[in-house]
Amino acid sequence: MAVNFPSIDPAQLHPVAGVTLGWAEANIRKPNRKDVLVVSVEEGATVSGVFTENRFCAAPVTVCREHLAKVRAGGAGIRALVVNTGNANAGTGEPGLAHARETCAELARLAGIAPGQVLPFSTGVILEPLPIERLKAGLPAALANRAAANWHDAAQAIMTTDTLPKAASRQVTIDGHTITLTGISKGAGMIKPNMATMLGFLAFDAKVAQPVLDALVKDVADRSFNCITIDGDTSTNDSFILIASGKASLPQIASTDSPAYAALREAVTAVAQALAQLIVRDGEGATKFITVTVEGGKSAAECRQIAYAIGHSPLVKTAFYASDPNLGRILAAIGYAGVADLDVGKIDLYLDDVLVAKAGGRNPAYLEEDGQRVMKQSEIAVRVLLGRGDAQATIWTCDLSHDYVSINADYRS
């Protein structure tokens, strides 16, 4: 059951000029469900992305990297994205690569563009052949119903074990020009740092030079999708894509040092964080949304390292599910996080406003009923003070319930 999942009104998902979306029911894995998405981008847009660090990456990830490398080398820009659910096209070897390229070629033929201008994405079951003929057969319908307002349908078309579609949108003013941003994401399990069974697509109408967009997508991913964890597994297919359509009146952003870049980064990060947090709120079997903040570190990297040790711990996550204030498990996770010179005698631990541990030991004033009161909440904040610097980092995670096991045990049935 999703945790405090906000209601998404399709009418409040702003169309982004220069971007249209269409979907189809292609029976990739199950009948009568949206399972193919096509996103078309008008000429002149810039597109960039970051992808899984799993060495067993899926075939479409390999093809996306190839096509974006050609764009960065001066080739024609990306004009379309195609996404299928129900099959990951991962662990499929050379036939899988051939199918990913065949998908691009077929969409390119139908749309009148080059195969290298298409980025393919797949999500679903690993180690099964992609039903390429069914996927290709769905492309004409997806192209036919493209519209700028189809963001909510698009969010539905990329769902797998998600229980709800995930989308976010906002408009901001930069240097007196209105910029529209809208995005969708999917994911409910196998989520950890460097992304995982996670797809995110975020479009906006600012005009951004390719090298600047390449920097922006990495920066935004590091502040959003790389700050979430559900079960600590890294998947084969995760991808986060930014589309800058260039249709707004704001002059091109050509430098990462410009005030306009800083303003755009703030806006894109806000939408990306909303999309990332929706994934955690819809985590498989999740009943609680947990924010873990580590402060007072020597570097943001070590703060995030400790935060993830807490967020990945099955013992910590099951304690939250049970509302059991066995909070020594958090201290243990801090201790094995791998920060070699950590002085545990300086560490304070808070659960919301409750000081649980002070200077590395139990706070004499701490009462277990206070800890349990917080742990019964559906929204919980864990705060760790390291006392060794000024850096900090925040991640978002969820608890681990019986339903998580059931969902994953029954995934293919």
Curated annotation (Swiss-Prot):
Pfam families: ArgJ. It comes from the Bacteria. Keywords: Acyltransferase, Amino-acid biosynthesis, Arginine biosynthesis, Autocatalytic cleavage, Cytoplasm, Multifunctional enzyme, Transferase. GO terms for biological process: L-arginine biosynthetic process; ornithine biosynthetic process. The keyword Secreted does not apply. Substrate binds at T160, K186, T197, E284, N408, S413. Its EC number is 2.3.1.35, 2.3.1.1. It is found in: Cytoplasm. The record marks A196, T197 as: Cleavage. SUPFAM superfamilies: DmpA/ArgJ-like (SSF56266). One of its GO terms (molecular function) is L-glutamate N-acetyltransferase activity. It catalyses: N(2)-acetyl-L-ornithine + L-glutamate = N-acetyl-L-glutamate + L-ornithine; L-glutamate + acetyl-CoA = N-acetyl-L-glutamate + CoA + H(+). The record marks T123, G124 as: Involved in the stabilization of negative charge on the oxyanion by the formation of the oxyanion hole. The keyword GTP-binding does not apply. The active site is at T197 (nucleophile). Heterotetramer of two alpha and two beta chains. Belongs to the ArgJ family. NCBIfam families: ArgJ (TIGR00120), PRK05388.1 (NF003802). Catalyzes two activities which are involved in the cyclic version of arginine biosynthesis: the synthesis of N-acetylglutamate from glutamate and acetyl-CoA as the acetyl donor, and of ornithine by transacetylation between N(2)-acetylornithine and glutamate. This is Arginine biosynthesis bifunctional protein ArgJ. It comes from Burkholderia pseudomallei (strain 1710b). The gene is argJ.
